[in-house]
């Protein structure tokens, strides 16, 4: 009770600080359910891979279809059904300095789920600065090399960059050496195009690169340790039953003393300000 009284002014009325937005569209949920195109493809799992990578790096990530301009990074995995109004809204977000992350299976259908007669990635082709000339659903893992190394197992867009820069290339199959992940400067912002699924470690490293480019801070912690940033404080939670050295330092709001980074099993710590 006494601890809660000390924290009251930091908690009551405060809000989580979200740097990233993961856009989930139910139109696209239903659209992908109708047309899988690849046996192991699952739209929800595709979204989760981006969410998990952000969580692993302790980036507060909202999940909605909200105001893009409120976030430094907007992730739109497999955003295939797009209205003309959405297209313009997304374009303006990037022009004004936002960082947009697109993936394979994006931009090719209108609000009625009708295919647009356009080269891939459809309405996003200009801002992504690429053309996906072909795609493959590989029968075995395909290696990925470049700024991020890993593998793809479900989907591979074969990308021809126009104004975009290649970040990763494929290391096997008939498209060996072709672009797998790109980034394009557009207006004051940038657009990442992820042409394939990625294993967990590779996805985490890609999200780290994207976050750094957008001036979003990442925090590495041991497994089971969560960091939540609010307006005037940072909350650290140990979801493990054992004591953990989080390596995080700061002034504790419980007693005003320097926190040494060690949390008891299932322990929690409130630190002053944002770490």
PLM region spans:
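Carbohydrate-binding surfaces of carbohydrate-active enzymes
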Residues: 1-275
């Amino acid at each position: 009770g006494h601890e809660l009284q000390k924290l009251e002014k930091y908690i009551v009325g405060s809000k989580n600080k979200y740097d990233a937005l993961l856009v989930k569209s139910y139109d696209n949920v239903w659209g992908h359910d109708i047309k899988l195109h690849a046996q192991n493809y699952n739209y929800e799992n595709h979204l989760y891979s981006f969410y998990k990578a952000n969580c692993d790096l302790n980036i507060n990530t909202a999940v909605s279809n909200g105001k893009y301009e409120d976030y430094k990074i907007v992730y739109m995995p497999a955003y295939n059904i797009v209205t003309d109004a959405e297209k313009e809204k997304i374009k303006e977000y990037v022009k004004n300095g936002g960082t947009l992350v697109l993936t394979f299976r994006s931009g090719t259908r209108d609000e009625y789920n009708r295919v647009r007669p356009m080269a891939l990635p459809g309405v996003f082709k200009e801002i992504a600065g690429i053309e996906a000339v072909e795609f493959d659903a590989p029968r075995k893992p395909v290696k990925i090399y470049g700024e991020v190394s890993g593998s793809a197992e479900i989907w591979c867009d074969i990308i021809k960059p126009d104004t975009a820069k290649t970040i990763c290339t494929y290391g096997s199959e008939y498209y060996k050496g072709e672009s797998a992940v790109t980034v394009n400067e557009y207006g004051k912002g940038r657009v990442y195009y992820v042409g394939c699924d990625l294993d967990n470690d590779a996805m985490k490293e890609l999200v780290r690169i994207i976050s750094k480019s957008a001036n979003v801070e990442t925090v590495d912690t041991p497994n089971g340790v969560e960091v939540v940033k609010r307006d005037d404080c940072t909350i650290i939670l140990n979801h493990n039953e054992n004591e953990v050295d989080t390596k995080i330092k700061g002034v504790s709001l419980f007693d005003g003393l320097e926190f040494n980074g060690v949390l008891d099993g299932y322990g929690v710590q409130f630190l002053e300000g944002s770490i």
